[in-house]
From Swiss-Prot:
This is Enterobactin synthase component D. Its EC number is 2.7.8.-. It is found in: Membrane. Gene3D superfamilies: 4'-phosphopantetheinyl transferase domain (3.90.470.20). It comes from the Bacteria. It is an enzyme of class 2 (transferase).
Length: 234
């Protein structure tokens, strides 16, 4: 499969972005994956996306001297080497991965159309969150896509500790040109309730990328700093 890779520094980490041509995918491209047999029943598009994600992950792992391919767990989650955390995401013809020594979550989403945003908004945000998104002055489809993506990133960062929390288990508390903050509710995980997560974001073409790598250890307070992460100039 034809791919191109480039690293991108962001929020104190290095993202590994792989653009790929799914039409060039061939079945034998999967053979270098240790778990290729488990992908046998997947569709062609899914196979291409999975392959691109693992290619990005291999580039990320090489940064820390690891030369293995992340396996696939019982829930189809990536299996990272001991002592490391990682995250993979893909959308359309782009996959990306990041590696860290602390919990991390990353997500990429195509910016919703106005019609899609109007249709999906009630399942992603509540009325309070809608007001925050509208107050950001970002176009609503972009703001809603960011809310969706940020919640996905937070789930990925803690996927081994939570079981498919709904979108109403984390609430948007602020949205700026560089970050979106979320307040975790008991429905997310009782042990993390009333904590705040700040997710960094940027736009790449018609997609957004969100990344979370820290959670505050203090109760939610809108007047207090939301994260130990620094904002990234854009």
């Amino acid at each position: 499969m034809l791919t191109s890779h480039f690293p991108l520094p962001f929020a104190g980490h290095r993202l590994h972005i792989v653009d790929f041509d799914a039409s060039s995918f061939r079945e034998h491209d999967l053979l270098w994956l240790p778990h290729h047999d488990r992908l046998r029943s997947a569709g062609r598009k899914r196979k291409a996306e999975h392959l691109a994600g693992r290619i990005a992950a291999v580039h990320a792992l090489r940064e820390v001297g690891v030369r293995t391919v992340p396996g696939m767990g019982d829930k189809r989650q990536p299996l990272w080497p001991d002592g490391l955390f990682g995250s993979i995401s893909h959308c359309a013809t782009t996959a990306l991965a990041v590696i860290s020594r602390q919990r991390i979550g990353i997500d990429i989403e195509k910016i919703m159309s106005q019609h899609t945003a109007t249709e999906l908004a009630p399942s992603i945000i509540d009325s309070d969150e809608r007001q925050i998104l509208q107050a950001s002055l970002l176009p609503f489809p972009l703001a809603l896509t960011l809310a969706f993506s940020a919640k996905e990133s937070v789930y990925k960062a803690f996927s081994d500790r939570v079981t498919l929390p709904g979108f109403n288990s984390a609430k948007v508390t602020s949205l700026t040109a560089t970050h979106i903050s979320l307040h975790l509710l008991p429905a997310f995980a009782a042990t993390m309730a009333e904590r705040t997560v700040r997710t960094e974001w940027f736009q790449r073409d018609n997609s957004v990328i969100t990344l979370v790598s820290a959670i505050t250890r203090v109760p939610h307070d809108r007047s207090a700093p939301a994260s130990i992460l620094s904002a990234i100039p854009r």
